């Protein structure tokens, strides 16, 4: 490969990476806004979050097409090929996170259209959502900086999100048993909590792809301890 073509190839890869980070920024804002409207009940903001999901979907298609063109034209190998595969996997998870954020916005809209005055377990929901957003932010940062030390931290945070989710479920069940009038709103919040738990799972996936990108090893379905040992080798 000539130096000129190599520079073009590097520029194409960098452009794709930049689009992934742009997509990640939109998705991160979606989640933050979706949790906010649970409290505020701003219907217009709910609609904007749902509209942003269309932009995320369009970006996924655009980046996917860019990756297909790069593979066809450049026939990348080794770490360059792993970069393209990592991008394709990452945008799939980002698109699914966007779907979950839009789902939360729709549930918030439903709750406030029914004039629900108190959102059950809102403080816990906000706390766990902040952990999930932090996971997403760290995963995107690891991708941007090729930081192999981050994924194990994200996996540990995912374990925390899973535990928080279980706690919220237990509290909601107790809440519904004590006051059956809260069943409808509590079920909506249960689905919000589940959406946040899934966001954490997708963010964890994204961090694990960074290890694959740098070391060429698949570290899905391993514990944080195993992952730490893997990246130290």
Model-derived regions: residue spans:
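Cytosolic, long alpha-helical scaffolding segments
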Residues: 1-233
């Amino acid at each position: 490969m000539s130096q000129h073509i190599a520079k073009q190839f590097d520029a194409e890869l960098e452009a794709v990476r930049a689009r992934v980070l742009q997509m990640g920024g939109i998705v991160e804002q979606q989640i933050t806004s979706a949790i906010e409207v649970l409290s505020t009940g701003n219907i217009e903001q709910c609609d904007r979050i749902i509209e942003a999901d269309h932009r995320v979907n369009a970006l996924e298609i655009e980046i996917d097409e860019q990756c297909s063109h790069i593979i066809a034209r450049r026939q990348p190998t080794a770490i360059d090929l792993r970069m393209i595969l990592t991008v394709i996997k990452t945008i799939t998870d980002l698109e699914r996170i966007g779907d979950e954020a839009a789902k939360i916005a729709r549930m918030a809209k439903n709750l406030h259209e029914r004039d629900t005055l108190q959102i059950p377990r809102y403080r816990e929901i906000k706390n766990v959502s902040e952990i999930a957003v932090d996971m997403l932010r760290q995963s995107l940062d690891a991708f941007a900086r090729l930081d192999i030390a981050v994924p194990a931290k994200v996996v540990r945070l995912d374990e925390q999100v899973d535990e928080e989710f279980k706690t919220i479920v237990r509290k909601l069940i107790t809440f519904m048993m004590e006051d059956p009038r809260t069943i409808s709103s509590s079920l909506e919040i249960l689905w919000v909590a589940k959406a946040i738990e899934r966001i954490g799972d997708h963010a964890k996936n994204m961090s694990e792809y960074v290890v694959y990108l740098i070391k060429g090893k698949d570290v899905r379905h391993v514990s944080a301890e195993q992952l730490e040992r893997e990246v130290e080798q």
